[in-house]
Amino acid sequence: MNRDLRLGLSLAVLVFSGALASCTTDSKLREADLDRLRSWYPGNYTNVAQVEKDMAEGIADVREPVNILIIPVAALAIGDNVFYVQQSDAMNPQRILSQRIHRFEKGPDELTLIQTILTLKQPERWRGGEMQPDLFKGIRPDDVQAGPGCALAWTFLESKFTANCPVVAEGQTPLRVELTIDELRLADLSFNGRVKAVPSRSADPLYRFERQ
């Protein structure tokens, strides 16, 4: 084997080894992000404090007072990292505004976590599931359908998760989510899951849900 060929092979091995090490590092980082998300995401949240602040400041379009309950569920037919998410009227908790299934997985590029929001085809069938999480062990792919909006790409930096739509269609308001250890922040949403812009809240467009 001549010297140039040996040198070429050595360089190829170094490049391959470097790429492999980078992929391994990215995979470990995303696994650490998943572990953190599994710890931070579940909980009881409410935006009542923000609603009271809106009212005190005389904002024209006061946000709806909403409670959000997020619990991990063992819905293995849907995915490995699955949560049941229920929104209810904070003034009347028996009034359920939405029920969703949220699934998280590592992105194909190992650089982000991807969140898919699924709609339950028969939401009444799963009502009360927050008290009986084992109920979701029986959920199947044909019990859900893709929800409105995009899959969200999550990244973790400086003690905060941030999630955005990787691709935003023309005319669509970008969806944004932020998660810290004690607060969940969401873009202005109507409860069909679509983003709605509210001009009077442009200075502070995020719903701020404090962990209870």
Task: Spell out what each predicted region is.
Residues 21-22:
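C-terminal motif of bacterial Sec signal peptides marking the signal peptidase cleavage site
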